[in-house]
């Protein structure tokens, strides 16, 4: 089970100097602040400051009462002026920066734009640099060549299905599939990047996180969350999608020869029956599946088993054959396998014994179709497009520009190679020094806070401080396996990944095989603790509990998160809270089960654990009362238990970032050393108020109702509005900054706090 926690975001750059002078802004004086006021009366009027101020003012609605609805106050202008792209379920600063970074990658790989970089003569290995750029451009060209993709028809997918199911017999003795045949089929799926109802993956061993071991998890659902299988409308759409895709792939008439889109009427009863049986099987899988809350619990999901023990629990699968089938030649599993849910295996054994072989075959066929169908030409993938669009609230008639899809393929398949050029053209090295300074100040704030927490006993306090000291920062881009700054290292790293300029389907299949082989080849080897999990252009930040690392790719070090030229109160409200969020993950309901090196064991005393649980329950209750509107105007409650870790991280991150910034401000009351100057048009706001406004802007977001429902069912994060309002409700510093009366919406008497 993957235990990496993610967090993302980004911002747009506006012009128009005249817009800085907005409509009259209410004067909000800070009350009760113990820190010094900003004595530096200088207003920065550089182009960067003017742009930053304009962006903040554009997003705000100063007529709104910040004490009643802070998200409306900080983001009301954003809600009014911004629109969701026709092909997206939401619009926010994640999307803004994602698009901005993708534009940069497109200029690298799209020859038609005439902006591609020329490998520098100063590159130590110009031949490698040239080969790398060629590889990127070949992959992109294969993806953009839709006529060649269409002319290949459905044959590539049919060949893949035939290969995977070559050993599968539907004429099993006694109505049960041979366990070795099933194991080999599951191994084939895994080797090509697909996970069926069980999946094996390699990662740090929970009890010895310096070494990689095998983990066994559940999966195999085609809908985003279990709840969708109880929604009749969605189930009907899903059955229709499966039936249409079977018709597309196996029908007698090739859909590319038709002049119309395939409809329900075109689908034979045979395919409809298959679809209903496949959905029925998945519905059973969903019913025995582990709840998201328990899957995220590192104690409940840490169940070491020998191969013999697993074989006894689920004898319908030949486990030695499955395991040997996914491991490279010469690699053997020598450690216990970590099972995420023994109860799921028990339920799966019952389900497999009650499922006829033909249904199982059709289910596996559907797995291959749903995973690889998007790599076919447009007519063949249309039913899949309609399903995914509908679940996000996007019109199925909307078509995403092909280049956007192809850039996403570059980022996925050759991300670090593209990242080499990204950091050369779009990443100022000065960002690293400044952001590391911010992170260190927040770590220092935590170190100062821990001893003041009366519920944290001496033994647990000692372990917490040790873990904080051992926390590792990974910044910008990987320098190991591969070194993103080195053309030679990148060429070597991707040397075994073939790329064709003319065969997009083969490229996708080869990448799946290559990435799986790279992962399984690490079994029993030391964990690479220097590699970032994603390429540098990624707009994310991470905390990895099994390595005790906080990770900040270059892609997130942009406005509204961070800008070297922005005042500290803006950077701490943006990037500082992000950094504090990731640090807090080390001590949330999941992270606190891992020690300083990432080992799972109980280093908390029972007394401290009980106190933590009581404090955590406050967050569960608070966020569980928040709602979002569904597509028909119905209320859907946020799952306070499912989002607990992220909510603790949001609240702790805001508090510690604010305290770290205040400490710096107190050490530099002139505001000169740490750039706490004023911004044009925002002079009426105090630095503390602008800190909180900067925080909220990170979460300004417009969403379609269907998208929101999807997220609260499948995501561990709260909806964006509640990541703003829910957090400031718990902040005395916010209430003081905006003079919110006790009992007002944003300053309730009862507040939740862990860290």
PLM regions: where:
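Hydrophobic/aromatic-rich, well-ordered segments within soluble, folded domains that form packed cores
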Residues: 59-81, 227-247, 456, 644, ...
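Active-site-surrounding "flap" and adjacent substrate/cofactor-binding loops of secreted or lumenal enzymes
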Residues: 44-49, 64-69, 73-151
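Short, Gly/Pro- and small/polar-rich lid/capping loops
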Residues: 35-58
């Amino acid at each position: 089970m993957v235990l990496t926690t993610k967090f993302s975001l980004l911002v747009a750059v506006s012009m128009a100097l005249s817009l800085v002078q907005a409509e009259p802004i209410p004067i909000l004086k800070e009350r009760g602040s113990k820190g010094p006021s900003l004595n530096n009366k200088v207003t920065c009027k550089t182009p960067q400051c003017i742009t930053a101020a304009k962006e903040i003012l554009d997003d705000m609605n100063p007529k709104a009462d910040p004490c009643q609805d802070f998200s409306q106050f900080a983001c009301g202008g954003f809600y009014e002026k911004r629109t969701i792209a026709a092909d997206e379920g939401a619009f926010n600063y994640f999307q803004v920066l994602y698009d901005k970074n993708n534009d940069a990658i497109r200029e690298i790989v799209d020859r038609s734009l005439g902006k591609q970089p020329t490998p520098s003569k100063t590159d130590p290995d110009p031949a490698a640099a040239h080969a790398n750029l060629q590889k990127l451009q070949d992959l992109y060209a294969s993806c953009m060549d839709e006529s060649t993709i269409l002319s290949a028809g459905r044959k590539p997918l049919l060949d893949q299905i035939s290969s995977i199911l070559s050993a599968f017999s539907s004429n099993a003795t006694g109505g049960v599939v041979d366990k070795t045949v099933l194991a080999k089929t599951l191994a084939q799926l895994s080797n090509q990047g697909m996970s069926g109802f069980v999946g094996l993956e390699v990662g740090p061993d929970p009890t010895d996180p310096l070494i990689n071991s095998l983990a066994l998890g559940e999966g195999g659902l085609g809908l985003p969350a279990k709840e969708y299988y109880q929604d009749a409308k969605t189930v009907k759409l899903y059955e229709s999608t499966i039936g249409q895709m079977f018709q597309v792939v196996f029908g007698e008439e090739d859909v590319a020869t038709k002049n119309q889109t395939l409809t329900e009427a075109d689908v034979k009863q045979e395919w409809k029956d298959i679809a209903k049986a496949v959905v029925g099987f998945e519905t059973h899988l969903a019913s025995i599946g582990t709840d998201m809350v328990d899957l995220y619990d590192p104690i409940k999901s840490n169940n070491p088993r020998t191969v013999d023990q697993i074989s006894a629990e689920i004898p319908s699968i030949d486990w030695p054959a499955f395991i040997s089938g996914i491991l490279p030649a010469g690699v053997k599993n020598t450690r216990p396998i970590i099972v995420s849910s023994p109860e799921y295996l028990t339920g799966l054994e019952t389900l497999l014994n009650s499922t006829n072989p033909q249904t199982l075959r059709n289910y596996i066929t559907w797995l291959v179709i749903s995973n690889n169908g998007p790599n076919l030409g447009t007519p063949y993938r249309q039913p899949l497009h309609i399903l995914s669009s509908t679940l996000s609230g996007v019109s199925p008639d909307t078509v995403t520009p092909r280049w956007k899809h192809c850039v996403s393929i570059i980022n996925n398949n050759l991300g670090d190679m593209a990242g080499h050029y990204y950091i050369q053209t779009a990443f100022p090295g000065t960002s690293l020094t400044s952001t590391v300074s911010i992170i260190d100040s927040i770590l220092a704030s935590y170190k100062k806070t821990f001893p003041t927490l009366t519920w944290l006993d001496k033994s647990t306090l000692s372990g917490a401080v040790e873990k904080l000291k051992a926390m590792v920062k990974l910044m910008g881009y990987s320098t190991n396996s591969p070194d993103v700054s080195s053309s030679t290292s990148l060429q070597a790293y991707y040397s075994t990944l073939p790329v064709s300029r003319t065969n997009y389907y083969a490229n996708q299949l080869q990448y799946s095989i290559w990435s799986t082989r790279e992962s399984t080849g690490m079994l029993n080897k030391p964990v690479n603790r220097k590699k970032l999990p994603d390429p540098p252009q990624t707009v994310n930040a991470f905390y990895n509990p099994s390595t005790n690392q906080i990770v900040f790719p270059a892609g997130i070090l942009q406005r509204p998160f961070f800008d070297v030229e922005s005042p500290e109160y803006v950077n701490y409200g943006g990037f500082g809270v992000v950094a504090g969020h990731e640090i807090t993950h080390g001590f949330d309901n999941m992270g606190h089960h891992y020690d300083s090196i990432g080992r799972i064991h109980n280093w908390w005393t029972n007394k401290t654990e009980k106190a933590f649980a009581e404090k955590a329950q406050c967050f569960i209750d608070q966020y569980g009362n928040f709602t979002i509107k569904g597509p028909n105007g119905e209320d859907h409650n946020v799952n306070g238990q499912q989002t607990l870790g992220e909510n603790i991280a949001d609240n702790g991150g805001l508090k510690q970032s604010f305290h770290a910034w205040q400490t710096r401000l107190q050490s530099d009351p002139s505001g000169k050393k740490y750039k706490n100057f004023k911004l044009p048009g925002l002079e009426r706001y105090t630095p503390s108020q602008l800190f909180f406004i900067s925080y909220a802007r990170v979460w300004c977001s417009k969403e379609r109702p269907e998208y929101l429902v999807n997220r609260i069912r499948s995501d561990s994060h709260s909806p964006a509005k509640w990541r703003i309002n829910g957090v400031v409700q718990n902040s005395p510093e916010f209430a003081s900054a905006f003079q919110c009366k006790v009992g007002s919406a944003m300053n309730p008497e009862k507040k939740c706090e862990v860290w």
